[in-house]
Amino acid sequence: MSLAFNLRAIPFSGHTIQSRRGLFPVHESPMITTKPFVAVKCSLTTSTDLMGKIKDKFNGKVHTSLPAITTHSADTPCNLCIIDTLQRLGVDRYFQSEIDSILDDTYRLWQLKKEDIFSDITTHAMAFRLLRVKGYQVSSEELAPYADQERVNLQEIDVPTVIELYRAAQERVTEEDSTLKKLYVWTSTFLKQQLLTDAIPDKKLHEQVDYYLKNYHGILDRMGVRRSLDLYDVGHYKTLKAADGFSNLCNEDLLAFAMQDFNISQAQHQKELQQLQRWYSDCRLDTLKFGRDVVRVSNFLTSAMSGDPELSDVRLAFAKHIVLVTRIDDFFDHGGSKEESYKILELVKEWKEKPAGEYGSEEIEILFTAVYNTVNELAEMAHIEQGRSVKDLLIKLWVEILSIFKIELDTWSDDTALTLDEYLSSSWVSIGCRICILISMQFLGVKLTDEMLLSEECTDLCRHVSMVDRLLNDVQTFEKERKENTGNSVSLLLAAHKDERAINEEEAITKAKDLAEYNRRKLMQIVYKTGTIFPRKCKDMFLKVCRIGCYLYSSGDEFTTPQQMMEDMKSLVYEPLTIHPPEANNVVGRKQSCVSN
């Protein structure tokens, strides 16, 4: 369904772009659609009213049609800003068809090198980023004029413009892309200097720059939305004329809508946490005396991946497998003997419940029955979703990861020498990304065939995202694992060079991080590529999990010893946003930022 609206502010970039017509979506030629259309008036006094009107429309209670609209390329800068705003506020899914139409038209204008895109630095950078992420073939060479700081007049551009260039530079998908590499170097240096010298008087803009610079690729989707909502200031930014052809949803209304949407998702996340805790208790996992209890962590990570209430089964399946994989990994590492660890693998291969006395220990019984009952339940649900049985696949994924756990256990306990390649050839599976993604993907609303799941593309997606998470994890757990005599990629890099020019720990860590970056870019290449066997909706899951790895292991081990995560968990799962009536957001003496019919 489509929602038409008016905006007269750019709530984040602060960069003012005037549009002569401001129609949204954009089409050079007339477009006629019979899709339902809702007009949300500024007379709405609460976000609840606004959400109610939108829900009524989505439920088909309003029957109108969108008239033919003729737009011009001059509207593109304004429309791209609106898309960026919708994405940052986390409500772009309600406007996906309009966004797709705009980006289709923007790509056509990009190919024609229209002045409306290429003459403004902010628009140029934003168009490049939005198009590349969507999968359009856009060359970074078009940004070459901005690649060298010496060629950019910093007296004529502001911090928000540099932010857009910085964000564009983050979409480098190949090591050879010197344009984006150079663009990243100078924009990141410039923005860091702005922070160090306190040169950004706007507090919210200062916080935004700091947030981007800390860990850009570790910004989890919903945490980014929460931060954007916190930094949204309807009274600060200059007005933007927009959307005469659309109805009157003012900037304050959009904020109220986005905040209400966030709170609805948050309530769902709290409900899912209760379901996880109940499942955890039912499985008797809370009685285990060893290992990590990551129920709240898994709920946070899956909630941060996606806020769509309709994807609850995806999040729950993913979270349950984070918990199960972690518990069994800890059992293999510390909780049980080698023989007991082998026993779990044998039980999963056999896939048959036994009398309690035949498991050998209560811990083995609890772990196996937790996997057995959870997988059987998910298999039944997935059968309905997929229209076919996927139980064998789910069991196979468990046999695979447990077999790798066994190999790693044997390797480190027997003190077997490994090369880095030998280690990575199996350890990317044991990080758990593959099993969590492929099982939860069954509930994404996409029919997954054997051809898709057994394809080289699927293997590459799984391997690249897992390599990122594995390598970054190794960097942060290197010291702990060295003390436990369980090597990882960093220790293997050090060992590999002992007969050559010796490298120190810092150099080994840098090499591991570089290898993680290489795999992250390879993952982006597959995800952004169009016409592949997996639809984009599926491939996006791999990118989301990649961000989880970057989030968890950028400066510590947030998974095992969460610190920043505890604060983020509060804001994402527990602390709702306070929503004020739209009128209350108006600044005294300033006209309401709405356009009337």
From Swiss-Prot:
Mg(2+) 3 binds at residues 473, 481. InterPro entries: Isoprenoid_synthase_dom_sf, Terpene_synth_N, Terpene_synth_N_sf, Terpene_synthase-like, Terpene_synthase_metal-bd, Terpenoid_cyclase/PrenylTrfase. Binds 3 Mg(2+) ions per subunit. Mg(2+) 2 binds at residues 329, 333. Its cofactor is Mg(2+). It catalyses: (+)-copalyl diphosphate = miltiradiene + diphosphate. It is found in: Plastid, Chloroplast. Mg(2+) 1 binds at residues 329, 333. The keyword Transit peptide applies. One of its GO terms (biological process) is gibberellin biosynthetic process. Pathway: Secondary metabolite biosynthesis; terpenoid biosynthesis. One of its GO terms (cellular component) is chloroplast. Residues 1-51 form a transit peptide. GO terms for molecular function: magnesium ion binding; miltiradiene synthase activity; terpene synthase activity. A motif (DDXXD motif) lies at residues 329-333. Its EC number is 4.2.3.131. The Asp-Asp-Xaa-Xaa-Asp/Glu (DDXXD/E) motif is important for the catalytic activity, presumably through binding to Mg(2+). Involved in the biosynthesis of ent-kaurene diterpenoids natural products such as oridonin, miltiradiene, eriocalyxin B and nezukol, known to exhibit antitumor, anti-inflammatory and antibacterial activities. Catalyzes the conversion of (+)-copalyl diphosphate ((+)-CPP) to miltiradiene. Belongs to the terpene synthase family. This is Miltiradiene synthase KSL2, chloroplastic. The gene is KSL2.
